[in-house]
């Protein structure tokens, strides 16, 4: 699908489908829209009245029109109340239009949308992101794709002439989101530690990034006992991925994104039982997928910031070689961990990844992981939990979340709760009591970052959508890519 920019006035545009956005408290047609309605023989007013269109956010109405009008179809989309209007309103409205257009077999859609904050650059980028993400469909594993012949071919943004750079930026970011979606959606017999490393190598080759893949023996030399303990039972070799983007000039900042990379999680010897959702555990590498997606986008955008993309990738499987409940592992910073639950493995892999990253001399680290069900219980499916002792870093991520529309909520790091992780025979256990489980998980990770400002994002909820949700789903969302890109660019 192509995104095009048009300098044609609304009154002069002609084509297949015209989409017009209206606010909930301003559905009465005035000015240019009143003139357009007159040109269209009153069809807009008639559509609003007959369909009882109120302009509620993301609501749509559709009609086909007669041959003597210069468009064949009309879509009205609601923007909600003006006081609630934000940049993500445009993304979601564009997504709603794209879905209606696809359903109605529109080939070309002209979008007439207002500006957010009088900013044509941010507005056009958001609209382009929304419609592309909504129209993406993953047919890789279908022998007979179910959307043949119903693709929108072109979307024209009316009144946004000159915003080519913004559209290019949107395309770059969307390419990263789609990569993350594809990695998360693919089954564990398709995406493995080996193929994840190959994907990272392809990104490095395509966009000129530096790459280092640490093999098992390399990780052994670095003392990564926590990561390798998880990897013991898998027949597939673990891969420790380190991609680096370096700008041509001296970087303003040096940052790292660290993603949890379990390409399948059986639970280990604490196996996930019936009803546990074990069949969905291909998604447990959602953090690593977002990390690689962000790498792909940032490598194209080329900001003046050095960024390291790191993931310890393996499977958590069952075999005679598997780590046992009660085993003690030694992480690469020397801390010992009593494994009281083999199904709390992600934090073990992240422990060694964070120790490694902390030694790089960076200005900030953000890790993201499908870490705990407790975070989903607390915040639901749409919101990631943010855990950090650093107020400045929290503010940066909250601003990036506001701009990207990928929601986060700062959670407490209550140090007292670390008491629940104390072990009688090791430095700590890998899980604590059930209450505050997402907090104790974050406190566990905190033990492996010594010198660098650090934040943890628990993305267990928003990494996957069970049903359609704006420009996401159903399926893998690619959550985290846009948030992380905005964070890096804000630097």
UniProtKB/Swiss-Prot annotation:
Mn(2+) 1 binds at residues 265, 343, 345. This is Probable cytosol aminopeptidase. The gene is pepA. It is an enzyme of class 3 (hydrolase). It comes from Trichormus variabilis (strain ATCC 29413 / PCC 7937). It catalyses: Release of an N-terminal amino acid, Xaa-|-Yaa-, in which Xaa is preferably Leu, but may be other amino acids including Pro although not Arg or Lys, and Yaa may be Pro. Amino acid amides and methyl esters are also readily hydrolyzed, but rates on arylamides are exceedingly low; Release of an N-terminal amino acid, preferentially leucine, but not glutamic or aspartic acids. Binds 2 manganese ions per subunit. NCBIfam families: PRK00913.1-2 (NF002073), PRK00913.1-4 (NF002074), PRK00913.2-3 (NF002076), PRK00913.3-5 (NF002083). One of its GO terms (cellular component) is cytoplasm.
């Amino acid at each position: 699908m192509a995104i095009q920019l048009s300098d044609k006035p609304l009154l002069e545009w002609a084509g297949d489908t015209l989409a017009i956005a209206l606010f909930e408290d301003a559905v009465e047609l005035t000015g240019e829209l009143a003139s357009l309605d007159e040109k269209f023989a009153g069809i807009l007013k008639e559509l609003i009245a007959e369909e009882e269109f109120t302009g509620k956010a993301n609501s749509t109405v559709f009609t086909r029109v007669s041959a003597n009008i210069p468009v064949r179809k009309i879509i009205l989309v609601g923007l909600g109340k003006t006081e609630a209007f934000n940049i993500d309103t445009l993304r979601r409205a564009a997504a709603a239009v794209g879905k209606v257009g696809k359903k109605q077999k529109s080939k070309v859609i002209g979008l007439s949308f207002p500006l957010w904050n009088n900013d044509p650059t941010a507005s056009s980028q958001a609209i382009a992101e929304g419609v592309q993400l909504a129209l993406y469909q993953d047919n890789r594993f279908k022998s007979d794709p179910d959307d043949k012949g119903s693709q929108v071919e072109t979307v024209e943004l009316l009144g946004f002439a000159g915003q080519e750079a913004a559209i290019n930026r949107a395309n770059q970011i969307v390419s990263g989101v789609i990569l993350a979606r594809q990695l998360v959606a693919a089954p564990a017999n398709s995406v493995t530690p080996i193929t994840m490393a190959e994907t990272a190598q392809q990104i490095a080759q395509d966009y000129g990034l530096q790459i280092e893949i640490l093999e098992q023996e390399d990780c052994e030399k670095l003392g990564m006992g926590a990561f390798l303990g998880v990897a013991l039972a898998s027949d597939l070799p673990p891969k420790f991925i380190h991609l680096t983007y370096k700008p041509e000039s001296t970087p303003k900042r040096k940052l790292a994104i660290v993603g949890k990379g379990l390409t399948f999680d059986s639970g280990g010897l604490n196996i996930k039982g019936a009803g546990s959702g074990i069949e969905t555990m291909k998604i447990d590498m959602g953090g690593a997928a977002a990390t690689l997606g962000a790498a792909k986008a940032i490598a194209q955008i080329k900001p003046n910031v050095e960024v390291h993309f790191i993931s310890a990738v393996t499977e958590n499987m069952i075999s005679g070689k598997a780590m046992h409940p009660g085993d003690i592992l030694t992480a690469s910073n020397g801390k010992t961990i009593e494994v009281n639950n083999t199904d709390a493995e992600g934090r073990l892999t992240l422990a060694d990844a964070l120790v490694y990253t902390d030694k790089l001399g960076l200005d900030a680290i953000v890790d993201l992981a499908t870490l705990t069900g407790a975070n989903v219980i607390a915040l639901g499916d749409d919101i990631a939990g943010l855990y950090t002792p650093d107020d400045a870093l929290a503010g940066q991520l909250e601003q990036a979340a506001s701009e990207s529309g990928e929601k986060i909520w700062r959670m407490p790091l209550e140090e007292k709760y670390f008491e629940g992780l104390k072990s009688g025979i090791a430095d700590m256990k890998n899980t604590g009591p059930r209450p505050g489980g997402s907090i104790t998980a974050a406190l566990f990770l905190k033990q492996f970052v010594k010198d660098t400002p650090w934040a943890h994002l628990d993305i267990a909820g928003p990494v996957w959508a069970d049903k359609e949700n704006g420009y996401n789903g159903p399926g893998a969302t690619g959550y985290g890519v846009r948030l992380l890109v905005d964070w890096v660019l804000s630097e």
